[in-house]
Amino acid sequence: MVELKGTHDTICAIATPVGEGGIGIIKISGPEATAIARRLFMRSGSGSGLESHRLYHGWIKDPVTGQSLDEVLVGTMAAPHTYTREDVVEINCHSGFAVLNRILELVLREGARLADPGEFTRRAFLNGRIDLSQAEAVIEVIRSRSEQGLLLANRLLRGALGEKVRSWREGLLELQSRIEATIDFEDDLDEDALCAVSDRARFVTRLDGELIPALSAALESAERSRALREGVSLVLAGKPNVGKSSLLNALVGRDRAIVTPFPGTTRDVVEDTFLLSGILVRVLDTAGLRHDPDEIESFGIARTIQSLEEADIVLCVMDRSRPLSAEDDAVVEAVASRPFVIVLNKEDLPPAISTGKIRERYGENVPIMAISALRPPDVERLRDFLNQRFLRLPLEQSGSAIVPNLRQRGCIEKALQAMIRARDLISGGGFWELASTELRTARNELDSVLGWNGDDALLDRIFSDFCIGK
């Protein structure tokens, strides 16, 4: 296990956002945590002891001046049953810049040092309470912006990914040990024993029938369920003045974009978010696509094209009260490579085009929704349609989905490729030594998911994303 420099000292940090509020928390972890608390905290009532995992009322006082700073609640937690597996103290005081920083100064003066970003969680990892995939899940929980994202992050925090990776790793270790036995003891084994440990078909069956499908399925599931973790991007595209901005405002439930009767009001991409079945939807209102934009509008259209290329879903918005035009054709052509829905807006006005005309022009299987962005029931129908058509599958899988982050997916992908190379070597009669090397590579990649490979630079990069106090 990697050991971080300074892990035997005592660290402290403000664990809550600094500002005016009801409660602020200062966290202390390390061998001197409880001793520091005893020197600063005067318990109310007749008692003086601080039992583990109990909360005590009292006052923080400067031991030098005797000045009382704040009325607090102090909790002490003895190792190893703590977040870091070290002695931990949490001082719950009033939240204000002056009081939090003054108490922190006293804790530092009594011998603690200021924690680095993520150092409490890093100590939890280094002390074996969590693996690296769980440590990374902490930041996922903090940054979750949707219910589904939170549920997935919580699943990782509870160790679901680490459990799978450890089982794959054990399977690899067993295969590799048999191969090493074949290599090391080939001259010492009789023919029957040698056949038993070096049966190539058995190795291939184990890889093809168990390990390779398991990793492949995990990666495929992660890709299918990506929307649950990362959300989806929904781009509103169309020619000018078809009601894209009105639709954006209706979807997010507030006046986010400027709406006027004049074409070309939206000159740049306007972005906001809303939740759909617990999934974060990032909706982008884009500049209208037309043949003769002015110079400023051209920049907005360039960004529109980029947004379309990156979109998960496109709503191709058309004005039902106006005849189809070459500009509508250009919009459909621009979005044809992405999952899209034609939204016939302004259904509250006399129609100039029909769904039949749309299908005749753009194809029988083109999905179409006729709505008015000004009517809430219509917008709700559109939400339901998007939910059923694009989000139903990931939501059905959400109960068991384990979605690793980008780094973890990269490690699993590399492990899978190494297993495939090992399989091909074994089935093709290649050298056992080369197959063993590939299996070792696969195991090292899985070790990286768990943080078992002693990579300090990797740990520094991961924990630098954390806030101080976590």
Curated annotation (Swiss-Prot):
Which major enzyme category is it? hydrolase
The EC number of this protein is 3.6.-.-
Any idea which positions bind Mg(2+)? 245, 266
Kindly state which keywords UniProt assigns to this record, in alphabetical order: Cytoplasm, GTP-binding, Hydrolase, Magnesium, Metal-binding, Nucleotide-binding, Potassium, tRNA processing
Location of the protein in the cell: Cytoplasm
Q: Does the keyword Nucleotide-binding apply?
A: yes
| Source domain of life | Bacteria
The record's section on CDD domains has: trmE, TrmE_N
Give a GO molecular function annotation for the protein. GTPase activity
Q: Which residues bind GTP?
A: 241-246, 260-266, 285-288
Q: Which HAMAP family match?
A: GTPase_MnmE
Q: Which family is annotated?
A: Belongs to the TRAFAC class TrmE-Era-EngA-EngB-Septin-like GTPase superfamily. TrmE GTPase family.
Q: What is this protein called?
A: tRNA modification GTPase MnmE
Q: Which gene encodes it?
A: mnmE
